[in-house]
Structures are given as C-alpha cells and as structure tokens.
C-alpha cells in the first residue's frame, strides 16, 4: 500500500506513486527575458517563482490494527501453505481503510530483494522452454531474439525475475481479482429480499443437487439439507437454494444489483492501479447471462471481483445500504502541520434499503453463531459474516478460501475480509479464514474501546480476574481462594502474601490456579508450556492444570464438544512463570464446509 521510490526518489508504486507530485512539491525557478542579442534585460522583465514544498500524508490506517491483521495473516499463510494470504479492515460508516495487508509482501526499503529460494526457483525455471511463469508471447519473443540455449535461459531468468517482482509489488486487495464464492450469497440474498421475490421465511427443500439446463449443480452436502428457510440456507451455504433465488430474480434484476453493489466498476479508492472489471471477461454481461450463467453467479462462481469491491459491498450491508468510496489518505499537511486538504466520506449510492440490510445482517449473524462461520464467533461481540470457498476458473483442483464479516452486528464499526489463495489440505473458508477474522475482530474492537455485551450463556463461561491478595495473611488468602473455587500453591515460609501470579486483575479461569509468594527473595516457580494444538477443550484444561498453567479459551465455548485447538499465545516448549495464563485458540471442523466439488 505504501509503495516505494526509485533511486531518483520518484514514486514507483503505492501511495508513493499516487501522490508523488504532492509529496515532492515544486522546485523554484527564475524566468528572465532576453533581448535580440541574447542579453539579459532589466529585472522588471524577470519573474521569480518560489519553490513549493511538498505535503505529507496522514493515513486512515491504524498501526495497531494493521499489526493485528498482519500477524494473523502471517500465521495462516504459514499454516495453510497457500500462495498468499490477504486481508483488509474497513470502517463501514466512512469507507476509511483501517488496515490492509498482503502476505507474502516485500521490504519497502529493498523492493528488489529476492530470497535464496526465489533465486533458485528463477534459475530452475529459466532452463525450461515451457515455464509456467512465462506467457506464450514472452516465450515467443525470447526465442526470436536469442539464438543460443544459454542466451535464451538468461533471457527467461530476467523476465521471470521481473514477473516475480511485479507480482510482489502488486496490491492484491486493489489490483487483483479472485473468485468470491459463497461470500457473494449475501448479495443474492439482499437482491432477493429487496425485490420481494423471497422473505427470510421462504423455504426450499435441498436434495443435494439441482438440475440447471443440461447441468447438475451439486450442494456441498451430498445428502442435501432438507427443507430449510432462507436464513438456514445462508447458514448452511446451500448452493441449490441460492440458485433458485437467482432464478426468481431473473437475469435483468440480478445484473441490476450486481451493478449497484459496484462489481462492474472501480471503487475509486485513492491507490494506483485499481483493476477495472472487464465485461465479458471478469463477469457475465446481461446479454450473455443465460440460465446457467445466472445460476452459477447466484452462489458466487463463474465471475471474479477485487477484494476492495467485496469489502465495500459487505460494508454497504453493514451500514444500512450505502455504498461508500474507500480511502486511505485522511488528510494532507503542509510543512507546518496545517491541514491542506481532508478526505470526506463519500456515499456513492444507496443500493438496498436499511430494512433489507438489517435483515441480511441478522441472517449473517446466524451464520456465525450456528452456521459455516461459527469459527468467527467472539464472546461478547456479535459478529455477522459469510464464508466462501471457490474453485478457480479454469484451474481445476485449486481453490480460494475467504470470509467476510462485520461487527458488532447490531451496531457495526468495522468490516473484515480475509482471503487465502490456494491453501493446501483444508480448503474451506469456514476452516481457514474464520479464525483469522475472529482474532482481528476481537483485538481491534478491544483496542477501539468497543464494550462487550455478553449473553446469559456467555456470562456463565466467562473468565474472571485475579483478586488482590498482596498484604493478606496466607491463611486468609487461602481461605478466600478455596471458597471461590481456585487452586492455591504457596511458595515460602512467611505468613503474609508478598506477591502473586496471576497478578491482581489479570484474566484467569474461574477454577484456575494462583501462586502465593510469602518471601521477597523467593525464586519464582516456572513451568514449561506444552503443545496444546490438536486437543479438545477438556484435554487442554487437564494438561494445563497438570503443567501449572491457567488457560484462556478463545473460540465458541458454547460448542465445546466439537472444538479442537489450533494455536496458542505462548509457544510450546517456552519456559514461563507458574500460574501464567496462556490463551489457546479453538475452532470447529464440524458443519463449516461450504464447497461442493
């Protein structure tokens, strides 16, 4: 997003390119008049133009939220072994971009850098006359301009190197297209509800497949979902149901909303090289949208969009139906810090009514509480979202996993879109992307000061805060803790508590362990952090207790029986203080599939 400059300090990509003239300013100059003999005339014919200093940019990006997003994407990139992991966080009410990250990225201070692995890859591909890294026209040009095998290999390496660097420098969020998959079903639902061709109570019986012209389109649940209403159709991510919604709309109305939500145009974000969708290439035109094309488009297949288009559309549902212009520059300042210009939120158009938006938001919340998006659940924050898993066009066996959401569902502040390109093993957005979004949502809303509102069921499962025991007698402290259900370990022979772990007010489980130290110079007890990954909640709790550690659960504890741990806040094998709280992240692999082969 920031981009970089060349050796001449001229912007080459990102904001450095977009705002190069503004950031650089204008050099001063003197214009003199000459007489017929090329001699200088009097000063009265001289014009002096003072230099104008460049302005500085203040971005909408929040460095804390940016770090949350980047850290989470780096983890899922490593775990999924995908080709890339991408994410964006937007203020749903203004269009301001709060965070944007592309993993694998590049070093802004050394944009030409390649890893040893990348260099080896370039060298190997350069020897091939059918390298997948080269287009047919590039290979043809190399063959025409180089006579020897060595020359052609060198030319290939140069082109492949440049291709690889250009790919690194591209901002996937604004410049690349992807297959949105089932996340797009929220658009189909919005259109169907707005046009009154369906209601939340409209029912459909899914048998596991549907016949469209000469094709059989399958649901990811081969045995079918049975009879379900529209809300459960979205929760279950049922393809046949949404095919029928698209067919009820008809091609003309479907295209009208496809266009209204911004999928046929640029969003207008203030970054360079935003991709312009090409009719007939990236999406079906109205003239070419037959029953098959309409049906596949209705559940998010057979067309491509940019991530910035998708999160802008998601934000429109979150904010009551207004399609905003996304932006990253909040204001420009002169050399003295004075505001030269300031970006104002821009509503491009109203795409659906507030009533429809609220209905869809409620349906999306059910996706997270009980549907394919359950791994995006965050206790105390109502999250509304939709999972997506799509097969790449013309690339059988390769997938894009994604999840789009906003929170809090009842009073939205932020929208989050997470995309993993070509994951290995688990391919579903409900498995891969939802936990990432949950972490970003939880940490971001906490940082923003958004207060949690717990349900009665959540209240029963809440962690507690360690009481202040310093200064109490050991006897009184132990009596209080045992009465409250805590386990107690005492270190030292003193009769008063000098310090404790966890410290006062730190988060810990209601039945956790507290260590009481009674001597100032007593050695602190330590514990080795186990590897909690791959365990059930019960197994994690037992292992933590036997290891002398407290556990904070992150995940939908209301569905504890189907949860498996996948990450932890302190690395396995690390030495930490006895009684410290370790956050263990859980997700479900049950009922989160949303893709049919």
Q: For the regions a protein language model found, what residue spans apply to each?
A:
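Flexible, solvent-exposed loop/hinge segments and secondary-structure transition points
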Residues: 65, 72-94, 101-105, 110, ...
């Amino acid at each position: 997003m920031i981009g970089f400059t060349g050796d001449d300090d001229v912007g080459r990509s990102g904001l450095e390119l977009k705002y190069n003239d503004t950031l650089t300013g204008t050099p001063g100059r003197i214009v003199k008049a000459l007489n017929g003999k090329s001699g200088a005339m009097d000063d009265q014919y001289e014009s002096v133009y003072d230099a104008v200093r460049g302005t500085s940019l203040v971005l909408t990006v929040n460095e804390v939220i940016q770090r949350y997003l980047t850290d989470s994407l780096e983890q899922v990139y490593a775990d999924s072994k995908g080709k890339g992991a991408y994410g964006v966080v937007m203020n749903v009410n203004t269009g301001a971009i709060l965070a944007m990250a592309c993993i694998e990225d590049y070093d802004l201070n050394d944009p030409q850098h390649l890893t040893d692995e990348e260099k080896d890859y370039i060298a190997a591909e350069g020897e091939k006359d059918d390298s997948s890294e080269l287009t047919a026209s590039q290979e043809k040009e190399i063959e025409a301009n180089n006579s020897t095998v060595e020359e052609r290999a060198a030319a290939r390496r140069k082109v492949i190197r440049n291709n690889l660097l250009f790919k690194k420098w591209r901002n996937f969020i604004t410049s690349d297209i992807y297959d949105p998959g089932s996340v797009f079903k929220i658009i189909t639902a919005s259109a169907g509800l707005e046009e009154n061709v369906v209601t939340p109570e409209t029912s459909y019986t899914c048998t596991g497949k549907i016949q469209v012209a000469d094709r059989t389109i399958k649901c990811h649940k081969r045995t079918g979902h049975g009879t379900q209403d529209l809300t459960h159709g979205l929760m279950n991510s049922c393809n046949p149901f949404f095919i029928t919604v698209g067919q009820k709309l008809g091609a003309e109305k479907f295209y009208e909303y496809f266009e209204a939500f911004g999928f046929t145009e640029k969003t207008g974000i203030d970054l360079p090289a935003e991709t312009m969708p090409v009719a007939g290439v990236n999406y079906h035109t109205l003239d070419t949208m037959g029953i098959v094309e309409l049906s596949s488009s209705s559940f998010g297949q057979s067309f491509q969009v940019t991530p910035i288009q998708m999160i802008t559309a998601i934000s429109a549902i979150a904010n009551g139906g207004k399609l905003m212009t996304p932006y990253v520059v909040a204001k420009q300042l002169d050399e003295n810090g004075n505001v030269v210009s300031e970006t104002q939120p821009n509503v491009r158009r109203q795409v659906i009514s507030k009533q429809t938006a609220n209905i869809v938001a409620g349906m999306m919340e059910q996706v997270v509480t009980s549907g394919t998006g359950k791994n995006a659940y965050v206790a105390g924050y109502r999250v509304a979202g939709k999972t997506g898993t799509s097969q790449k066009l013309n690339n059988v066996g390769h997938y894009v996993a994604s999840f789009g959401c906003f929170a809090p569902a009842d009073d939205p502040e932020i929208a989050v879109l997470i995309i993993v390109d070509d994951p290995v093993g688990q391919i579903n957005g409900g498995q891969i992307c939802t936990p990432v979004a949950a972490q970003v949502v939880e940490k971001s809303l906490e940082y923003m000061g958004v207060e949690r509102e717990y349900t009665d069921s959540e209240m029963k499962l809440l962690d507690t805060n360690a009481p202040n025991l310093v200064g109490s007698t050991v006897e009184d402290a132990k009596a209080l803790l045992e009465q409250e259900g805590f386990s107690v370990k005492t270190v030292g022979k003193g009769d008063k508590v000098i310090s404790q772990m966890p410290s006062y007010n730190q988060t810990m489980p209601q039945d956790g362990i507290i260590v009481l130290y009674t001597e100032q110079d007593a050695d602190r007890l330590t514990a080795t952090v186990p590897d909690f990954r791959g365990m059930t909640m019960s197994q994690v709790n037992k292992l933590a207790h036997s290891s002398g550690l407290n556990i904070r659960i992150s995940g939908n504890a209301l569905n504890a029986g189907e949860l498996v741990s996948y990450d932890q806040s302190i690395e396995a094998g690390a030495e930490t203080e006895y009684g410290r709280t370790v956050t263990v992240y859980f997700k479900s692999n049950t009922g989160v599939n949303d893709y049919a082969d």
